[in-house]
Amino acid sequence: MATEEMKKLATVMAIGTANPPNCYYQADFPDFYFRVTNSDHLINLKQKFKRLCENSRIEKRYLHVTEEILKENPNIAAYEATSLNVRHKMQVKGVAELGKEAALKAIKEWGQPKSKITHLIVCCLAGVDMPGADYQLTKLLDLDPSVKRFMFYHLGCYAGGTVLRLAKDIAENNKGARVLIVCSEMTTTCFRGPSETHLDSMIGQAILGDGAAAVIVGADPDLTVERPIFELVSTAQTIVPESHGAIEGHLLESGLSFHLYKTVPTLISNNIKTCLSDAFTPLNISDWNSLFWIAHPGGPAILDQVTAKVGLEKEKLKVTRQVLKDYGNMSSATVFFIMDEMRKKSLENGQATTGEGLEWGVLFGFGPGITVETVVLRSVPVIS
């Protein structure tokens, strides 16, 4: 794999992840959620929420929000109370701090001086501020003040693919570039009490978690000091036909409000083969079970329908499902948790490559639009 052509490709060189300290077990969450939102009187709604949690295939999640925070700021726990100011303040501070924790882990694994980081890409769902989280992280990490910064807000669950697409373009077109990506996601802006008229809001309360991931991307790695993990071969973005309005988020005085169509899993799964064919036809690959898979776990129904539509073997989304089980849906950061888990499991299991022993793989991001990001990956030999 270490040909001159491959050396020119952008590669992921390090991965770091972080979560808030507060761990919530899914089996206990309905009781916690309805208690802290003063909603225990909504007995039928609580039963619906319990079923959502039971069917989520999530075991635990990490959240910044605590009972103490909700007691001090009761409007956050209400369904549509004015609360944006306090949410925003927590989000701005928390996103930067959690992102810093993940970034320091990635930089430590990379093992090179921070002065070699030439570009910074930061992505988070909310917390729009000036200067933004990119500026805050530059300061918190003590990066060179001339680092070239990019800031993405309000992209959502597909954005892990977006930032890789941008990092690939930067790394391959700027000699010596080393790009630090930080995706830091918190649900502080969208936590709210239940509503009998807005049931899709409860889906988010049942599956979303907080987490940050950081990766370092560069082309032409110095193999004496840098260790590639995955090569970024190609990238693509598309809007799913007839999907307008299927996934939306609106920032209101009461925080970020999500709206989802029940048809989201069908819309995504019906179009996944087209995305695969467009990405892999140039490589003469049409056996989707010959790939390793890193798919954003928007929820179990999406994973189930994609598996069925593509004819995937059960084990293909094993790592994706494990991350969903252990962390929930952490928006843009989730695919990097999956990528990190996959390379670790490949080493633990004695497999030949970072991609479960396979050479070629695909990373998918699904989110508002419906937008689909597709990244073709190539694994590298495992070095124990």
Swiss-Prot record:
Keywords for the protein's UniProt record, in alphabetical order: Acyltransferase, Chromophore, Hydroxylation, Transferase
Xref: Gene3D superfamilies: 3.40.47.10
Chain positions with S-(4-hydroxycinnamyl)cysteine modification: 157
GO BP term (any one): flavonoid biosynthetic process
Domain of life: Eukaryota
InterPro entries named in the record: Chalcone/stilbene_synt_C (IPR012328), Chalcone/stilbene_synt_N (IPR001099), Polyketide_synthase_type-III (IPR011141), Thiolase-like (IPR016039)
pH dependence: Optimum pH is 8.0-8.8.
Molecular function GO labels: acyltransferase activity, transferring groups other than amino-acyl groups; protein homodimerization activity
Recorded metabolic or biological pathway in which this protein acts: Secondary metabolite biosynthesis; flavonoid biosynthesis
Keyword Lipoprotein: no
Listed result of changing residue 190 to G/T: Normal benzalacetone synthase activity
Outcome of swapping residue 331 to V: Enhanced benzalacetone synthase activity
Catalytic activity as recorded in UniProt: 4-coumaroyl-CoA + malonyl-CoA + H2O + H(+) = 4-hydroxybenzalacetone + 2 CO2 + 2 CoA
Any single Pfam family the record assigns to this protein: Chal_sti_synt_C
Function: Polyketide synthase producing 4-hydroxybenzalacetone. Can use p-coumaryl-CoA as substrate but does not accept hexanoyl-CoA, isobutyryl-CoA, isovaleryl-CoA, and acetyl-CoA as a substrates. Catalyzes the initial key reaction step in the biosynthesis of phenylbutanoids.
Entry similarity comment: Belongs to the thiolase-like superfamily. Chalcone/stilbene synthases family.
Subunit structure: Homodimer.
Protein name (database record): Polyketide synthase BAS
Source organism phylogeny: Eukaryota, Viridiplantae, Streptophyta, Embryophyta, Tracheophyta
Gene giving rise to this polypeptide: BAS
